[in-house]
Curated annotation (Swiss-Prot):
Top-rank taxon: Bacteria
Keywords, alphabetical: ATP-binding, Chaperone, Cytoplasm, Isomerase, Nucleotide-binding
SUPFAM superfamilies: GroEL apical domain-like (SSF52029), GroEL equatorial domain-like (SSF48592), GroEL-intermediate domain like (SSF54849)
Entry's EC annotation: 5.6.1.7
One CC-aspect GO term: cytoplasm
Record's function text: Together with its co-chaperonin GroES, plays an essential role in assisting protein folding. The GroEL-GroES system forms a nano-cage that allows encapsulation of the non-native substrate proteins and provides a physical environment optimized to promote and accelerate protein folding.
Record-listed ATP binding positions: 30-33, 51, 87-91, 415, 480-482, 496
Native organism taxonomy: Bacteria, Pseudomonadati, Pseudomonadota, Alphaproteobacteria, Hyphomicrobiales
Record-given protein name: Chaperonin GroEL 1
GO terms, molecular function: ATP binding; ATP-dependent protein folding chaperone; isomerase activity; unfolded protein binding
GO biological process: protein refolding
Catalytic reactions on record: ATP + H2O + a folded polypeptide = ADP + phosphate + an unfolded polypeptide
Keyword Isomerase on entry: yes
Amino acid sequence: MAAKDVKFSTDARDRMLRGVDILANAVKVTLGPKGRNVVIEKSFGAPRITKDGVTVAKEIELEDKFENMGAQMVREVASKTADLAGDGTTTATVLAQAIVKEGAKSVAAGMNPMDLKRGIDLAVEAIVKDLKAHAKKITSNDEIAQVGTISANGDSEIGRFLAEAMQKVGNEGVITVEEAKSLDTELEVVEGMQFDRGYVSPYFVTNSEKMRVELEDPYILIHEKKLSGLQTMLPLLEAVVQSGKPLLIVAEDVEGEALATLVVNKLRGGLKIAAVKAPGFGDRRKAMLEDIAILTGGTTISEDLGIKLENVTLSMLGRAKKVVIDKENTTIVDGAGAKKDIEARTQQIRLQIEETTSDYDREKLQERLAKLAGGVAVIRVGGATEVEVKERKDRVDDALHATRAAVEEGILPGGGVALLRATKVLDGVKTANADQKAGVDIIRRAIQVPVRQIVQNAGDDGSLVVGKLLEKDSYSWGFNAATGEYQDLVQAGVIDPAKVVRTALQDAASVASLLITTEALVADKPKKAETAAAPAMDY
């Protein structure tokens, strides 16, 4: 086992604080509408330019192991806030730095760290209640666009695209962000259920100009296994031909004799038919086939359920108004499934989302939910250079999370004002002793820091602005750093999602409290490089 280096009390906290400062100082320059860029070197390709706090935080690794511990703890604040709320990472970092700085001073002055932590917790609890009480639910499209614009560092085009996407696919719908190959940013909305499997054979194509299959009012056969022989399917195919409707086959695979026969029949014009592979793998494939069955009002043909292919009747097949299949995707529009069945299925998926601990599973479940409940919107972000596209894509991702958070818990005045106004609530917090009161005061000073930093980044005097704001009693009256004016921020469209502000404060206080109550640090001692032996001189 490697030898360890151990640091105690003030020495330990000072080292950690240095790391916290290095990371937070690099992140906080990005805060606000006039936040600056940070350029990050990449081991290959052009450097990356970003205004996204968590991206900067994730890139910072310090040489000194004890300083690095402090930096990594604050990086954890940014990552956690990004995971929960999707935005507010810079605010969380700035708050954490302020709480740790003030807390370390108090501990050095001889106060009890555990009482300080208790005071911090009481203050945060009171502020969270105040934020929830003042949060305003958002209903209009304009408000959603405003949230998106603010989170995208004032880019109104991004805000407009997000509002349009959310209007079209609903709050449950999936909105994905991709890099475009052109200069323009565009929005594409896929109505109905889409999955990433194209036609098995190009011979099924009905629209040769666009190279895609279009089936109007088709029957849909959902089969769990491979189809290689057609003998067992003949009774069903005859029934479909007599009905005069097209048929879509969704199966694990269609191969050999089955595929050849279907293609020949399609080319001769006797049978309007197309086949696609089932989406997903393993258990997820079963679940997705079940989703398709519920959406189209059909039954999954599975050996597990004791249903054999030769016994399948038309009533077991799904129906849809239209199916469009291209080389890569299949879209089922307006499935004939019963509304109550679809709602029951979406409720079941929501429960699974709440219970799962895996981020990957959660993402896949949310995709399935969106396909059943709403639709899918794709925002393709354009730009003149690759660096610009990447930077814009970062901002669109941030803005997307922020708008979702705003719909969930409502909005507050932006510009750090909601936290600043919460200083009044702290006057009523009851504490058991002087050290706990000092903990409350640490938060009182820390929640002024975001406003100061936003103003400072805009080139004005932070202390002066904070003083002016505290003189005036109106909750949403604040300083608009983008224009340099004092005004009602909600009316001016400078708004923050309540969830983002709340999460930033809670995460910052949680990690900062841990740093304040730290008394020892343990790290591996750096290994001394062994010098190579000199070559023998026997010549």
